[in-house]
Amino acid sequence: MDIFYINLAKQIHRREFVERNFAAVRRPGWGLSRIDAVTAAAARDMPGRIKDTEKACFQSHLRAVEKAQHAAGHVLIAEDDMLLGEGSLPAVQGALAGIAEDDWDILFTDLIIPNAGPMANFYMLRQRLALSGGSQLIDLGNLNFAGATAYIVNHRTRRKVLQALADGSPLDLPYDLQLRKLIRSKILRGHVIVPFPTSVSAFADTSQIQETNLADAVWTAFRRLTWLERDIDAAMKPLAIQKAEPGAEAFARLLTAMQSADYKKK
């Protein structure tokens, strides 16, 4: 499978990191190609209400999806803050083996889940799957999600994906939210692999598109905790200085206790 990663020409350090990371975990049959990202200046005059940086991001992903039309098989499209581990590529292959090619258009390998309830469900599912060493595909048709750091485009339906995204409409939603809209409206079929086969590198802590705030830090920590090869201490470090109010901290302890093997449902 080919990985197409999106990268601005001036972001040399990000490019070098992606290429070193891929070289360290590469498996037979996998390749890596760079997609030259569209700049905010080049996207400025495109119609739509979103910011110029978001327009540029949208057009960069479209450029990658267009290139995917000519690939030999499925393509993993990634931003240049994607992180691969030793088990990432085998995990992707294992997940693909578990779903018929006619049943999906896009498979995410990492996502933002912005709401606490579904976030907890994902975490508990990851815990269960870690014990069995398996993975599970979650249908995104009715789920609130965001992010487009890494996702696989089905070679059988790639034309459909491109046509849905490049329909000539003004760019009024960021790329990830447009994907979510298309999936929730059943125009595209999207799933996410759990545990997440990929994660985000340290570059994700300094977004090129939006300012980082507490919500971003929480979502990034969740993504790293749901990763197949998570490092709990590293994932939580950016949140170490956050002080929870007493009630929230107490409730968090209840949830922690419910994760114990000694906790039995009645």
Where are the regions that the model predicts?
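An acidic/histidine-cluster motif and surrounding catalytic segment
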Residues: M1-A78, M82-K266
